[in-house]
């Protein structure tokens, strides 16, 4: 039986939570929840110059919005510097690491020499065997050394990867790399190993780009004499053109998707599909199913291709099936941003409109756009609609009859309005589309949307008639008969 699973997500607060990072967090979280384990949030903030509180806040809010909760943390690396120094000193005392006093100029010369010899640059190990006396003299001179790990010159380091199988690295390609910088800060690889060991991390699930760091990290584990966790490197998320996903491919951060009106459940559903799928192959599923079925063995080795159209299609499904109150609450900030409502609004009225508008829309932004004419006067008419319906012979007379009919209608609701329109079609001897289409364009400015009589009921008699009369005026003034 597996001991308690402990996994972590360790973002650097130097940017936003993007789709790849969100997927890494999600896969760790699903794995922990599937096994009844712990999901730990750690913040890799040792790059003090680039780390910002704003970025950290955005990452935490993004995870919370997606429903990815953590059991421990956030734990900040910048608050653990004494721990890294303690472990580095242990390696120095045991002769597994050493002080290196090489200057920038000396390292540059080594780099040039490697270039001249046509080989990749590797640190030569110049300071590997300094005597105690030499070290003391350098320190007395005020030289600030880095600390390097003594790496084996021969043999191979093998990464046993749950997703990729065994990946071998030749030790001759790994130089004596730095574990502590001259300013006393740990390097990424060293801090990562110390943290993962002290936090009892059992499985490291992360992006494929970290695979090249793994042999160095294994060598640190071995030098410290502590057990290795299991590794699982998840393939990259590529853009549709199969290049690295970047801003030029549109929205890539969780915050951008949130601002564009995607629902958190839809994003979680979609990013779960980036390299994994449920047993039945379904594309729409909730997070409970993902937790039940998730396993690393079924994560694909092949790169996942990001497809915003598929995400939007999935989002449309969630928009249609979402709890109506939750959807209404989610849409309100978008309506406020568009200036359609203020701080005080008629919640029930908005909810009724959302119930009919959502059937055709795919994002909250789409819904807010589609709701515009319920709150504001129609400012323009779709050009294709004008050409198709407002230029037809007799349309002004038809709309005048419609306005007159609706003015005298009591009571006014979608059922009585439809009945009156059906009768008018018969009286005028025209097709229903000759009346319905220009009316829709007149009262909404659009050629499609919810049911025509639903719109009329929401607007009420006065607004409906006024908009038809305004359209008549527009046709008479702008369209030459």
Curated annotation (Swiss-Prot):
EC number from the UniProt entry: 6.1.1.17
Alphabetized PROSITE patterns for the sequence: AA_TRNA_LIGASE_I
Compartments it resides in: Cytoplasm
Record Pfam families: Anticodon_2 (PF19269), tRNA-synt_1c (PF00749)
Main localisation: cytoplasm
InterPro entries xrefs: aa-tRNA-synth_I_cd-bd, aa-tRNA-synth_I_codon-bd_sub2, aa-tRNA-synth_I_CS, aa_tRNA-synth_I_cd-bd_sf, Glu-tRNA-ligase_bac/mito, Glu-tRNA-synth_I_codon-bd_sub1, Glu/Gln-tRNA-synth, Glu/Gln-tRNA-synth_Ib_cat-dom
Protein purpose: Catalyzes the attachment of glutamate to tRNA(Glu) in a two-step reaction: glutamate is first activated by ATP to form Glu-AMP and then transferred to the acceptor end of tRNA(Glu).
Protein's UniProt name: Glutamate--tRNA ligase 1
Organism: Caldanaerobacter subterraneus subsp. tengcongensis (strain DSM 15242 / JCM 11007 / NBRC 100824 / MB4)
